[in-house]
Each structure stands twice: as C-alpha cells, then as structure tokens.
C-alpha cells in the first residue's frame, strides 16, 4: 500500500481572493489529476503481464473535490473508490451524478463514491453558495440526494457494540488546530476535531472507504451531553458532549433505548 499526496495543480488563493468560487482552476487541475491517475494504472500494467493493475482510491477535500470530480469523469481507467469530504461543490451541469464518474460499482450497481459533510463545517457551504454569485447558478453539494453518493456521518458517536467513542468533526479543516472557545472556531476545526484527525468518526470512516472497506461503516450511537441539574431536582442533557468511551453500564443503557 502507498499513499500519494497529489499537489500538481494551482489551487485557489485564500480569501479575500474569490478564486474558490470559480471552477477554472478545478477544470485545469482535473485534467492533470486524470493524467496522473491513468498514468499510475498504465505504468503498473506495462511492468509485467503478471502484475495486476493497482487499486486506486481517491480522497479529496474542499476545492479538491471539485477538482477530483472533473478528473474522475475524464479517466480512461476507473478507480476503486472516491471519497469527498467538506466539499466546495460539484458542477452539476457537467457531472449529473456520481454515476458519471469513472469509479467502480458495488454489487448492487451503485458507484463507490462516498461523501461526508460535518454540520459544524461552516466553510464548505460558503464555497457552494458563493459559486452562484458569479452571474449563474453555482455548484451543488454532493452530500445532497441529487448526487447519488454513499453518505456517511462526521458527527461522532459511540460504537454500538463496544462503546468506543469517535469524536465529531468540528470545522472545515482536515486537521483541527483552533483552541476550543476561541474566535477561530467560527470557521476552523478545534484541535483533534478535523476531518482526518485520529479517533474522529470521519477519519475512521475515510480509512475504511479509501481501502475498499466502506461496507464496514457502522451507524453510531449519537454523542451524549453531560447532564446539568435543573429546578426541582431534575437534570437536563445540556452540558458538554461526552467524548469518551462509554462504560459497560452506559452502553447497556444506550442499547436498551
């Protein structure tokens, strides 16, 4: 197994630049990415008749999903899976659904295209909505039904069998860095709560989808809040989220609900 971090194109400048609202850089980058992906397959195939073609899995974030969508449509050789997280939107006029991408299909005939968008990601929607401010209807969110991808959660939760906790994604970043409670958290993910951070639900699921094991994704028990005392001896689940493994007793209580 090998991991290639592909940075072979000009990505948009950060705000206040409006480049992220355009698809021009994504189209140009998509052409280059398609050539790279096809090159991996063809190079491996030319080495020996006894060597099987590589199993390629594409993982893309933010504007990279826009770029990857153009690449995947242009491919000559299908990849095994594609995973989009925190997407800046897909150009629906050119890519009508996940089925338009050259990605392998599961036994039921559905493309192995996985999508996730965290509810606390406030940046990705800006790219999608903002792309429509340039005089025409803009890009659409691949997490919505029109795209036909396989959606999975980034909200965190507890494994229903073991009680193990998986943290939520709390922002747009692949790797969280912001201090909890600071002004940075309006848009940035807090430390340990980025899409690819260890022990997050999103990071765990992306590890599965990008190694051909997306069928093993579980639906988790939603994260609980600590209970705070209220009037009349009552308590209410309004405290911080409990991001630790559940005790056997707590897990049994959740399983019985």
Question: Model-predicted segments: where are they?
Answer:
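Lipolytic serine-hydrolase domain surface
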Residues: 1-54, 74-257
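Gly/Ala-rich beta-loop-alpha elbow adjacent to hydrolase catalytic centers
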Residues: 59-68
